[in-house]
Amino acid sequence: MAEFSPKLKEALSLVQKPGRYTGGEPGCTYKDKANVDVRMAFCFPDTYEIGMSFLGEKILYELLNRHENWWCERAFMPWVDMKEQMERLHIPLYCLESKDPLTDFDIVGFSLEYELCYTNILAMLDLAGIPLRAADRDERWPLIISGGPCVCNAEPMADFFDIMQLGEGEQMLQDICATVEAGKKAGWNKDQLLFELSKIPGVYVPSFYDVTYLPDGRVESIKPNCPGVPERVTKAIVKDMDSFVPPENFVVPMVGAVQDRACVEVLRGCVRGCRFCQAGQLYRPFRERSPKLISESARVLCRNTGYDELSLSSLSTSDHSRLEDILDELNSWAETDHVSLSLPSLRVDNFSQSLVEKTTKVRKSGLTFAAEAGTQRLRDVINKNVTWDQIERGCRIAFAEGYTSVKLYFMMGLPTETLEDIKGIADTAQQVVDLYYSMEHPKGKGVQVTISVACFVPKPDTPFQFCAQDRRETLREKQKYLLSCVHSRKIKVNYHDSATSVLEGVFAKGDRRMGRVIETAYHNGAFFDTWEEFFSYDRWLEAFAACGLDPDFYNYRALGLDEVTPWSHLDVGVTHAHLVREYQKALQAQTTQPCNRQCSACGANKLLGGPCFDYSKNSL
């Protein structure tokens, strides 16, 4: 473990939670720098507690460190008090393992999980003393890269990154490290390195593409300016989930993380085709891990880390075709080891008594059902394929098994939504309350139904990308109306300020010009925009005005079905024709079957090189 400098010791003595910045946690990796050829700093643009909850970092950290001559370390966005001390004492941003500044690394990688973390990325580069824009960095600086779901529309942050990874990182990031290693040995300059990196499936080099605009501000084209790079960058995927063993060790945080438990990814992708859900489109095609590998990896992970809770992670865990087998495999050792099982992504339509029994042998965890919309009409519009009868059945099973609290997740501002749909949210919650009291229940034990309502944001690569977003004032009125429809003290309503959703929508569909706005807002004091106490909507409006851009143009304007978008040159697998088809079906409130029952011809199968499912069998 590296020594603490006198300046760092002073800073740590003056901040809350110094454990965020010390490293030395169980499970972290140390190597002899003399034997390391490639050093990578994995940077998460939020606090330690949030970043240490991110499964993607855990997967890639262990995967890269399996290579003897590569060393992956970690850095997080310092909290305000530590940021001030680092600036005062001139301590550059460093990695926790070696305490070396980011400028000592070959690769500095950021995870783009959420649009409102963009200014934190600039803050971290600034703290490290690294020029913000890629054009201002030559081969003497680390290669600045990014990955994550926000790369599906890379353009708002394109000016700040040398390369951006579209798709899944397990193989792509190893190929990047291998290419950087080769470039160091061969003495390539930056342009040579970027060109070689552009050959890797999923790697997007923004500087190799020029953007032109129409007089009305829409994108006219995004085309390569360098011979030999692809017209469209196609995302990288892991074809066989069993080809990469899940992490068998985690860095166990010194400061309590938001999600502090063992976690194994059981599948990737989703069969459901919800029209609002970006993740369900981005992570297609659907791929499963085998029950045996899941169980073996999970057992080793729990024993290595000491965790007594195991989460089975995915977009929809209950859609795994062999979920019962997975639970049987896990329960063969979990109860003996006093490890409880958690299924965070359950579909109410395949929730069963058997699942409850197999996941509550040690202790009960929370129960959340995503109804998404308050009426059947709107659930059909968004292709949720869930009925009230299924919601009632799921809650009935839960109450019969002793649950006395249920969380229901909804969205507000969905396309075609009316006030009747908003009232339906309150009505659904009241029906759940009434159901509880119509059943046998412990004497004196009441029920708590929590409604969590998010503001809908149209996202790229979804059928609703063509839709305009509800205005902030409209969302506020809908929130007030919902509260007026709730009359029971057994129902709790949670929602957040619509201003952050509006800004999220602007960045989600923004073009490359958005980088100037982000940089301007950062220089004017914007960072930690995901935290209510630091977010300033007015500051962002001032940044838009200073850059001569109108935020309304991006999120309050419907896209033409044939419009060139800022993400048209990035291929996530799902075709434009499929998105148009699903959008038109949504306007007619027509549903589409889950793709393991009937292929919807979305196009993602091309990434596998064949069909996603054997339709000669009944997959569900």
Please annotate each region the language model reported.
Residues 78-223, 460-511, 519-532:
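Glycine-rich beta-alpha loop elements in corrinoid/cobalamin-binding modules
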Residues 42-43, 47, 107, 116, ...:
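Conserved SAM/AdoMet-binding glycine-rich loop
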Residues 9-41, 48-49, 206, 212, ...:
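N-terminal [4Fe-4S]-dependent radical SAM core
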Residues 1-29, 40-42, 487-620:
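Radical SAM enzyme core and accessory elements
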Residues 40-46, 64, 251-276, 302, ...:
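N-terminal pre-triad scaffold of radical SAM enzymes
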Residues 69-81:
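A short beta-strand-loop structural module common to alpha/beta enzyme folds
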Residues 57, 89, 125, 159-164, ...:
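Short secondary-structure boundary/capping segments
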Residues 54, 256-292, 601-616:
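Canonical Radical SAM [4Fe-4S] cluster-binding loop centered on the CxxxCxxC motif
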